[in-house]
């Protein structure tokens, strides 16, 4: 479990542009990242658009807390250099048990978060939110879990490549479990009003 996250842990690698994750640096090109990760990296024929960035290289089945995640190397559309790293669990696998394992693994690696919040949904069309943020040495690590609130059982609850998690969760609204690593000051803070 911590083997994969051990690569996330501070202190940051030498150099002002270090991301603090697996010896990567802000501004690296897809080609440089591809050389670093070799066969573990998958080049995408069609890049995924993230608005201000795109991902044309991913790592599949990256272990966080004992579960497989996908790592998206988000490249700046203007400079084509590494802008942020997003580590995301597939939507059907983004369930409370997996979220708890991921948050526990992050706390084991980084210690207590700098900022944390939890907001429970109070209406049928809202989503509950759990967010934890670590800020160190010019880098922000943000873990976010949005859970749907409709009280219906999804029969395909947590089916994902390589594992199956049982339990109950809401269905109807898309769930989300992700970890974003970015330069400090570049990430939105859903917890801002509740600090």
Segments (PLM) and residue ranges:
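Bacterial N-terminal signal peptides that target proteins for export
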Residues: 1-6
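Non-cytosolic coordination micro-motifs
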Residues: 16-53, 88-195
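N-terminal signal peptide c-region/cleavage motif recognized by signal peptidases
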Residues: 9-14
């Amino acid at each position: 479990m911590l083997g994969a996250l051990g690569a996330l842990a501070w202190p940051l690698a030498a150099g002002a542009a270090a991301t603090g994750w697996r010896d990567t640096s802000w501004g690296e090109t897809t080609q440089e990242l591809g050389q670093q990760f070799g066969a573990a990296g998958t080049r995408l024929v069609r890049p995924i658009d993230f608005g201000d960035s795109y991902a044309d290289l991913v790592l599949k089945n990256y272990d966080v807390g004992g579960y497989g995640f996908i790592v998206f190397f988000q490249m700046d559309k203007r400079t084509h250099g590494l802008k942020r790293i997003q580590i995301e669990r597939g939507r059907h696998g983004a369930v409370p048990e997996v979220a708890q394992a991921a948050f526990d693994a992050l706390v084991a690696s980084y210690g207590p978060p700098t900022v944390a919040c939890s907001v429970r949904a109070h209406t049928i069309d809202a989503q509950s939110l759990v967010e934890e943020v670590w800020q160190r040495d010019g880098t922000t690590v943000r873990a976010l879990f949005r859970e749907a609130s409709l009280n219906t059982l999804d029969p395909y609850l947590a089916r994902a490549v390589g594992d199956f998690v049982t339990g109950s969760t809401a269905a109807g609204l898309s769930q989300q479990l992700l970890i974003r690593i970015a330069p400090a000051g570049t990430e939105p803070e859903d917890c801002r009003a509740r600090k």
